[in-house]
Amino acid sequence: MKKVIVISTSLRAGSNSDMLAEKFAEGAKASGNEVEKISLRGKEIKFCVGCLSCQKTGACVFNDDVPEIMEKVLNADVVCWATPIYYYEMSGQMKTLIDRMNAMYPKDYRFRDIYLLTTAAEAEEDTPRRAEIGLTGWIDCYGKSSLKGHLFCGGVTDARDIEGNACLMQAYEMGKGV
């Protein structure tokens, strides 16, 4: 059994990326894994100010929801990120959280397998490329981990447009395969 954390970064209710995250989580649970889905919707996540206090003390100077999320990520075997693509890039919330996770850098971590779920109005295959590159930059800082899978579902604009889309089953199967 693996400990799986699924981080849904969209702030929109009924978002397509959140629905993919839910299916991934369901698949991972169906395989007997311990799964927790974290939605950034309603979370307080302040911007990193680059003070690097976290590198000296191991903790960020801000008191918000990030330390709790970070602790869960550090202790997970699998981390799945779900993000809508905005202007061909990951959501601002996802990037802000990644920046704030700088405090994790000197710490030991369990995660090895990273997954990325992306959705966008644009349907071209290379639409999420920059988001994947951005996440890979974070992954590269954790030498024992790697990107194990990326699922992109394009052509979904409005909330819940993804309902009935084959991508939902693909997310479920990807989760089941962790």
Describe the role of every protein-language-model region.
Residues 119, 155-161:
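A short acidic, helix-capping loop that chelates divalent metal ions and anchors anionic groups
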Residues 38, 117, 151-153:
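Hydrophobic residues at beta-strand termini and immediately following loops
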Residues 92-93, 105-149:
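Short, glycine-/small-residue-rich phosphate/pyrophosphate-handling segment
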Residues 83, 154-155:
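Residues that line or immediately flank small-molecule/substrate-binding pockets and catalytic motifs
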Residues 1-83, 88-104, 148, 160-178:
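N-terminal beta1-alpha1-beta2 submodule of the flavodoxin-like/Rossmannoid cofactor-binding fold
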